[in-house]
Amino acid sequence: MRLFRIPLLAMGLFFSVSFNLHANTVLADNIHSSAIALRDKKSALSKSTTIDLKELIADPKKYDFFTFRPNLEKLILSGAADTQHISILWYTIPNGSVGLHYHSMTESVYTIDGTQTDAKGVYPTGSLYFNPPESGHKITNSTGFFILAYASPPDFSNTDKIKPYTPVQINTADPDLEKNYTFTYSQAGVKVYDVPLDPKGGMSSKIIKSTSLIRYKYLGNYLLVLKGSCNINGKVFDKDMLVVAKTIETQSYSLSATAGDSCLALGLSF
């Protein structure tokens, strides 16, 4: 028996050391992963602007709007007016208007509060629409606030290039939104509707519904909470909160539901 005692002890010591090394490696990997996750959370939000749209509507003069057209103010959130950009438009009078203009790339419009009208329809609060590349329109009878995203700026000179088009329209306030549009499961507890946009238009968009506390990763330029309460990169945002990248560079956002509430959000990406 003595002949086997030393090897067995040595073997036990070997397994003990190996187990400890493995455990320490796993622990170090977990700490490293947690540190990376925390860094990414802080990084995305530090590179983003957060806007409470209710506060903006209540007191728009607190923000750095500039005059875009007569009786029409614009707040640039990312990018620049003469390039692709995300902005908020504010009609300062009832029945505001914008002259005919051309969109060489996709345009996105979300009605924060009010109504926008063009030849294709009337878009009340909660409406989302996308005009495809080579489209164009004239705005009439419009008032309120709107989130705009342009893959290229509106062109008021080359209106002869406008071709027949059909906008993609979504009523985000529709109580049957999830029934009327094809949401597919991306992961457990997360359903996504990919808005059918022309891939040549330089823009993509998703509507994300989460009932899970497990994070869904979204690479994009903004997230708008449409309903419920969303945890975005470790911070809770309620309805009408907008998180938008400060530049046109996309950011890695993580999104989940919060305890006791679901999350419905609109994501847009260049």
Report the location of each language-model feature.
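Classical Sec-dependent N-terminal signal peptides that target proteins to the secretory pathway
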Residues: M1-T25
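A short, N-terminal "cap"/entry segment at the start of jelly-roll beta-barrel domains
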Residues: N24-Q84, F156-S204
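Short histidine-centered beta-strand/loop micro-motifs
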Residues: I88-W90, V98-H103, K120-G121, T140-N141, ...
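Tight coil/turn sites that cap or link beta-strands
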Residues: I93-N95, G126, E134, K200, ...
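Glycine- and acidic-residue-biased ligand/ion/polar-headgroup-sensing regions
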Residues: I93-P94, H103-D118, T211-N233
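Short acidic-glycine-tyrosine-enriched beta hairpin
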Residues: T117-H137, I232-Q251
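A short hydrophobic beta-strand segment most commonly corresponding to one strand
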Residues: T143-K161, T258-F270
